[in-house]
Regions:
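Intrinsically disordered, low-complexity boundary segments flanking structured domains
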Residues: 1, 23-25, 43-47
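Short intrinsically disordered terminal tails
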Residues: 1-6, 61-64
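Short aromatic-glycine-(Arg/Gly/Cys) micro-motifs in beta-strand/loop hairpins
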Residues: 3-32
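A short, exposed loop/beta-hairpin motif centered on an aromatic-Gly-Thr core
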Residues: 25-42, 60
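Short, mixed-charge low-complexity intrinsically disordered segments
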Residues: 41-64
Protein backbone atom coordinates (compact mmCIF):
# COMPACT_ATOMS: atom_id res chain seq x y z
CA UNK A 1 0.00 0.00 0.00
CA UNK A 2 1.36 3.41 -0.97
CA UNK A 3 1.66 6.11 1.68
CA UNK A 4 0.24 9.50 0.78
CA UNK A 5 1.79 12.55 2.39
CA UNK A 6 -0.42 15.51 3.11
CA UNK A 7 0.98 19.00 2.85
CA UNK A 8 -0.46 21.71 5.09
CA UNK A 9 0.41 25.41 4.95
CA UNK A 10 0.28 27.57 8.06
CA UNK A 11 0.51 31.33 8.48
CA UNK A 12 2.97 32.48 11.12
CA UNK A 13 2.42 36.13 12.01
CA UNK A 14 5.17 38.10 13.71
CA UNK A 15 3.35 39.08 16.90
CA UNK A 16 6.38 40.00 18.96
CA UNK A 17 7.04 36.44 20.11
CA UNK A 18 3.51 35.53 21.19
CA UNK A 19 2.17 32.19 20.00
CA UNK A 20 5.12 31.18 17.81
CA UNK A 21 4.67 28.21 15.49
CA UNK A 22 8.36 27.32 15.41
CA UNK A 23 10.67 26.59 18.34
CA UNK A 24 13.58 26.16 15.96
CA UNK A 25 13.87 25.76 12.20
CA UNK A 26 13.14 22.03 12.60
CA UNK A 27 10.80 21.92 15.61
CA UNK A 28 7.17 23.01 15.88
CA UNK A 29 5.40 24.34 18.97
CA UNK A 30 2.16 23.19 20.53
CA UNK A 31 0.28 26.08 18.87
CA UNK A 32 -0.06 24.18 15.57
CA UNK A 33 -3.27 22.52 16.76
CA UNK A 34 -4.87 26.00 16.99
CA UNK A 35 -3.32 27.51 13.86
CA UNK A 36 -5.23 28.39 10.72
CA UNK A 37 -4.15 25.94 8.04
CA UNK A 38 -4.61 25.58 4.30
CA UNK A 39 -4.15 22.69 1.89
CA UNK A 40 -3.54 25.00 -1.10
CA UNK A 41 -0.50 27.29 -1.16
CA UNK A 42 -2.21 29.78 -3.49
CA UNK A 43 -5.14 30.14 -1.07
CA UNK A 44 -2.69 30.69 1.78
CA UNK A 45 -1.03 33.64 0.04
CA UNK A 46 -4.42 34.95 -1.06
CA UNK A 47 -5.56 35.03 2.59
CA UNK A 48 -2.39 36.88 3.61
CA UNK A 49 -2.89 39.51 0.91
CA UNK A 50 -6.62 39.91 1.60
CA UNK A 51 -6.01 40.57 5.30
CA UNK A 52 -3.01 42.88 4.86
CA UNK A 53 -0.50 40.53 6.48
CA UNK A 54 2.10 40.85 3.70
CA UNK A 55 4.79 42.47 5.83
CA UNK A 56 4.32 40.48 9.05
CA UNK A 57 3.41 36.95 7.93
CA UNK A 58 5.43 33.93 6.90
CA UNK A 59 4.08 30.72 5.38
CA UNK A 60 5.24 27.48 6.97
CA UNK A 61 4.76 24.31 4.93
CA UNK A 62 4.54 21.07 6.86
CA UNK A 63 4.42 17.55 5.44
CA UNK A 64 2.21 15.24 7.50
Amino acid sequence: MEEVSVTRHYIAVNAGGWYPLLKTAQDYTEYFHEALSFSDLYETYRYIEKHGLDKIATVITRML
